[in-house]
Amino acid sequence: MRPIVLKGHERPLTQVKFNRDGDLVFACSKDSVASIWYAINGERLGTLDDHSGTIWSIDVDESTTYALTGGADFCFKIWKVATGVAVHSVSTRSPVLRVEFSPDGSKLLIVLDAVMGHIGSIVVYSLIRNENGEIVNVKEEPDYEITTIEQATKVFVASWSYNGKYIIAGHEDGQISAYYGENGEFVQAKKIHEKSIKDIQFSPDRTYFITSSRDSVASLVDVDTFEVLKTYKADCPLNSASITPLKEFVILGGGQDAKDVTTTSAREGKFEARIYHKVFQDEIGRVKGHFGPLNYVAVSPTGTSYASGGEDGYIRLHHFDKSYFDFKYDVEKTFEVERRQQLQKQE
């Protein structure tokens, strides 16, 4: 896979995302700017420039009309994608670590950091829209605030489950916790990692999700039961993991801590994206290129490409080639042959 290298940031990338159609890539960075790119050729579409500090997180709504960013400058902003203008800005009590639109686009999920005397929390706001579906305002008072549960440390990441039924959070001590999306009521918590959880990404139907942790393990977890379905063990701390549509794979990204990078070669630092089989849990390939840790990996909803954002300030956009789609285990090939024979008998 020959990548398209996107250079639009002066500092490390913090998050990379595709829109629902998979034709645009959204990225944010520690240089206080977010960028938008065409996924097909890597051409730069524009920038979102109004923050005064690190942008930790970015999201885009289902219709690619609005983008949402949150950062270290104690605020989150809503942008018109077509114009690149920030139409709403809301101040927060502490830096914003993660932002996300709810699946139906009616609410915002905001994760606040545990600094400045704030214990860390997840805040949910409702959006006020007009009859044309345009966002008129963000409700002044949040719908509810989920403070860090007593038996856990601060929340690093959070995301909505299917239909916005649950909010799933990943904690600094390796726990995951669930809350009802309607009112923020606590549902359950479970410790599945030994170190902090850096990322949570959902399957296309949002019924299960993958966590990535600094303990070098990624876990596939059922939303309703918190049963750990699969585990993927890497040889380096992980920052991000994503589930691929079309093929039964997961992609993991990470590497040695950024503070140790200057004394380490790229090979020793493990600065590669790793592709694992989702069912059999085997590593089936690696993609090199970054010369620093991978801070985020995201797979296109179309399943035809993935993007990685690195500590080196580059976004590497990979379009999967034929060998990726042709790869099958012997058991998969056998199953397909048997299934074809059964269908022929039925005819």
Swiss-Prot record:
Its main location: cytoplasm. Keywords: Cytoplasm, Initiation factor, Protein biosynthesis, Repeat, WD repeat. WD repeats lie at residues 8-47, 50-89, 150-190, 192-233, 289-328. The keyword Chaperone does not apply. InterPro entries: eIF3i (IPR027525), WD40/YVTN_repeat-like_dom_sf (IPR015943), WD40_repeat_dom_sf (IPR036322), WD40_rpt (IPR001680). The keyword S-adenosyl-L-methionine does not apply. It comes from the Eukaryota. GO terms for molecular function: RNA binding; translation initiation factor activity. It is found in: Cytoplasm. It holds the Pfam family EIF3I. GO terms for biological process: formation of cytoplasmic translation initiation complex. One of its GO terms (cellular component) is eukaryotic translation initiation factor 3 complex, eIF3m. Belongs to the eIF-3 subunit I family. Component of the eukaryotic translation initiation factor 3 (eIF-3) complex, which is involved in protein synthesis of a specialized repertoire of mRNAs and, together with other initiation factors, stimulates binding of mRNA and methionyl-tRNAi to the 40S ribosome. The eIF-3 complex specifically targets and initiates translation of a subset of mRNAs involved in cell proliferation. Component of the eukaryotic translation initiation factor 3 (eIF-3) complex. PANTHER family: EUKARYOTIC TRANSLATION INITIATION FACTOR 3 SUBUNIT I. This is Eukaryotic translation initiation factor 3 subunit I. The lineage of its organism: Eukaryota, Fungi, Dikarya, Ascomycota, Saccharomycotina. The gene is TIF34.
